Amino acid sequence: MIKSVIHLADVHIRTYRMHDEYKEIFQTFIDEITEYCKDYKHEEIRIAIVGDLVHQKITISNEQLILSTWFLRELSKVGKVVIIAGNHDLLENNKDRVDSISPMIELLDNPHIAYYQESTCYLDDNVVWCNYSIFEGNERPDIEEGRAKHGDDKTYIGLYHAPIAGASTDVGYIFDDNHTQLNHFDGCDMVLLGDIHKRSCFYNVERKEIDETELEIYKKNGWVIDE
């Protein structure tokens, strides 16, 4: 049974710049989540990377490939890794070209790393991942069909990499109502988002109380734990 989900997005690994700094931060992150998850079994942990693992679309380098695959391999030792693509991981205007994540997945050939590319519902133990795939224009998966197939006793978690109406950027720009509305995620119990680098949180149905300790963690840049 999955008991803990670690959520990160917008890693933006460059082709060769700042790799020493990236690796130092990655190692700190891995050490932190390893300590946090020490009371969980490997199969109880999921690490969700919600788009933009790399930065320069399909321009990749040997250095980038080495660092990216090292990061994914180390994460997979903590728990199963779930990845979706973001706008920096592919050419949106030419999807016939291979994206930058696929070669890593093929080379790693790791059963503890899953790469979801379709807008559909993926069963994973007691969780159903509802992927709004960028390869299919962030189309809403058929969550109703997924619930009929997999049951309502699962937790349905959306994966989405694109702006949301009402989200704000670090410079204060707010995305207007022409962008995706929260009802696009109807049927999901929660949604893990990527793309906008300023951390935001939306509550569509009921308000969640956050204690002071949680709030201080939430305000920081970095990663989030969902239990």
Per-region residue spans from a language model:
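Hydrophobic residues at beta-strand termini and immediately following loops
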Residues: 8, 132, 213
